[in-house]
Amino acid sequence: MAALKASKKRKAVTRDVEEEAGVFSGDELSSKDLDGALSDNAHDLLSDEDASDSEIELIDDYSSSEEEDDEELDSDEIPSEGEDEGVVKKKSTAVLDLDGLEDREESTKEEEEEEQLNYRIEKDANGNDRYVYDEINPDDNSDYSDVDENSNTIGNIPLSFYDQYPHIGYDINGKKILRPAKGEALDALLDSIEIPKGWTGLTDPSTGKPLELSQDELELLRKVQMNEIPDEEYNPYEPLTEWFTTEKEIMPLSAAPEPKRRFVPSKHEAKRVMKIVKAIREGRILPFKPQTQEDEEDKDVIKYDLWADEAERPDHPMHVPAPKLPPPGYEESYHPPPEYLPDKKERKAWEDADPEDREREFLPQDFGSLRRVPGYENFVKEKFERCLDLYLAPRVRRSKLNIDPESLLPKLPSPEELKPFPTACAAVFRGHKGRVRSLAVDPTGIWLATGGDDGTVRVWELITGRQLWSVKLGEDEPVNVVRWRPGKDAVILAAAAGDDIFLAVPPIADPETEKASLDLLDAGWGYAASKPAPKPADEEKKSTPPQWIRPSAALADSGVCVVIPLRYIAKTISWHRRGDYFVTVCSGASTPASVAIAIHTVSKHLTQYPFRRRIKGGGPPQTAHFHPSKPILFVANQRTIRAYDLSRQLLVKIVQPGARWISSFDIHPTSATAAGGDNLIVGSYDRRLLWHDLELSQRPYKTLRYHRKAIRAVKFHPGGRYPLFADASDDGSLQIFHGNVTGDMLSNATIVPLKVLRGHKITGELGVLDIDWHPREAWCVSAGADGTCRLWM
């Protein structure tokens, strides 16, 4: 067989052979001599005897063999090594395989050596022939190793099967291996004291003797224990061979354009999908395979969860979790907003600064798309510093207070517990043409006075909504404000229309009250007559106080008694609690600062200008009110509210609401009496309602933002009987609040939203323009830009 393999291996070599003198003598070889030099696959499969006796023959039909070989190679199968042996191709002439002759002689010698017998024939006890083979001596190339003659050959059988026998198995020759004798306890003690090298304390199950390790096994265990490489021939520090990156390829492997089939859906796949869809529709393919009997049987198998009873291991008492990294911001985005990108000046300042002084470790950049983002150069450094912080920096556990946010909010009472307050519209007052700019309820709570863009002042009966009196004060000028004189001893109505202030006594009261009202207004004429007449030069000055005059005959017949020419349009009127003084504010931008605020005395028919210069900061004045119990005048401009002591002529306090433009404010009626301090509410055109506690701070105590448009008017309930206040807004709604003020200095005011009242229509971007309360009931009246007034109960 060895000769056959050698001959086959030699025949696989196909190369051109040069002619040698020792092989050819110049004569041509006969076909008999060349038999076997060029053999096909059939000759390769001959036996050893045929191979040794084969002759050399010439291959006449070489072209046919080439065609057969070509046909075999044209197939999809790759010819094996055995099929390629002996196949010789030449375009012009056939080549003689002369090396085959030399190999043939060598194979003949090897076959003769193999023919030597490795056994002998002996006679057995019956006289028959018995073959006795010689022992095999393995060389270095053999896979067999020396077999220990005393080794146990019972295989993978437990030794407990031999417990009742005196032996424990058989050796390679079939002889019994006797059980080793066991030593006494003293011998075992001595063996444990004098431990030999390689002692393990275990028993070899195959021999029953103590198991001892060899020197090689001990060395292997030592290397494993020392974390060394067991194989001595292995080199862990071999030079790195970069198979794919050694040479940089500049040109692409293939520059062919992408074929169209890469972008067009495959028609063959579509056909296959349609076949599957058709099969599913016909029922030949079931998309949801029903459960088989085996699956149903698996349900009966009891399955156990290995981790069902696993208990979570508690953390170490000293364990402190690592703090989390802060989340990334907009500046770390690959496409940050433009305001986060630095300009040239900021970039240069960052580059010139020391790394320790820089605010951040990088500059925000805009890459446009994520695929253009390069590697971050400080990534490894930041991770290393993070590891150092986790490893070296001490950690502190800070316990957080688990406080319910709802518990921090004040306990507000339910609105149902705070009744009465207005909830619905009870009456609608119609009669004005255009917007109703102002309204006021008289101190008795019986009559309602209104003024509008049509220049008329109307008095209504509050309960029934019936109009009782009306007077037209101007043709083209609207009535900006109407206010009743406080007190029940007289019925005097002040109205501002155009540049004049009108004081009227409507004929609606009883004769005694009406006569007392007329006498109160007529008493000032005598005081005015006793004063010296002003000079013509002084009358031309703008800062000269105006002289009170009598109205025209038509107005006098209508009930108007006094006219005060201010020369500027007055926007607000506010009476003093005693009814002898009232203050007017001309908030126009063209009004001089010296005449913007005027205080009028009814008993003397006297007008005074307390401010000679404009109030600092905040623009022109907007409105003014007297304190309900102190000689203090509050004046509000666009941004601040100032409190002046009229008796001492000093600035007492400056209130800073923080609003952009103050529209109105009101003072709590019980300020400085039961409450122990002054409380204000301020409305602004920037949709904010602010509550001020002047004893607490100059800043707002509460800021309420419930309206969608500007707030036009705010008002406390007069008298302090009901802790209510309301505001009116251009969004067409009124909001009613509960505002309780106590005399306890340790408690603050309680503010509770109660009701939102809607009914006025928004006309010309204007909604509710004014609001007032009934003096005794929890009723309020509102004036709207839609030309109506509404009574809310």
From Swiss-Prot:
Q: Where is the composition biased (Basic residues)?
A: 1-12
Its name, as the record gives it, is Ribosome biogenesis protein erb1
Show the SMART domains listed in the entry. Answer: BOP1NT, WD40
Matching entries from Gene3D superfamilies are given as: YVTN repeat-like/Quinoprotein amine dehydrogenase
Please name the gene that encodes this protein. Answer: erb1
Q: Report the family membership.
A: Belongs to the WD repeat BOP1/ERB1 family.
Recite the lineage of the species.
Eukaryota, Fungi, Dikarya, Ascomycota, Pezizomycotina
Q: Where in the cell is it found?
A: Nucleus, Nucleolus; Nucleus, Nucleoplasm
Which Gene Ontology molecular-function terms are recorded? Answer: ribonucleoprotein complex binding
List all Basic and acidic residues biased stretches: 29-46, 120-133
What ranges does the record list as Pro residues composition bias? 323-340
Q: Where is this region: Disordered?
A: 1-150, 312-349
- SUPFAM superfamilies in the cross-refs: WD40 repeat-like
Any one GO CC term of this protein is: preribosome, large subunit precursor
The answer to keyword Ribonucleoprotein applying to this record is: no
Compositional bias (Acidic residues) spans? 47-85, 99-116, 136-149
Q: Which domain of life is it from?
A: Eukaryota
Provide the alphabetized UniProt keywords: Nucleus, Repeat, Ribosome biogenesis, rRNA processing, WD repeat
How this chain assembles, per its entry, is: Component of the NOP7 complex, composed of erb1, nop7 and ytm1. The complex is held together by erb1, which interacts with nop7 via its N-terminal domain and with ytm1 via a high-affinity interaction between the seven-bladed beta-propeller domains of the 2 proteins. The NOP7 complex associates with the 66S pre-ribosome.
Q: What does this protein do?
A: Component of the NOP7 complex, which is required for maturation of the 25S and 5.8S ribosomal RNAs and formation of the 60S ribosome.
What does the record list as GO biological process?
Answer: maturation of 5.8S rRNA from tricistronic rRNA transcript (SSU-rRNA, 5.8S rRNA, LSU-rRNA); maturation of LSU-rRNA from tricistronic rRNA transcript (SSU-rRNA, 5.8S rRNA, LSU-rRNA)
Q: Which HAMAP family match?
A: BOP1 (MF_03027)
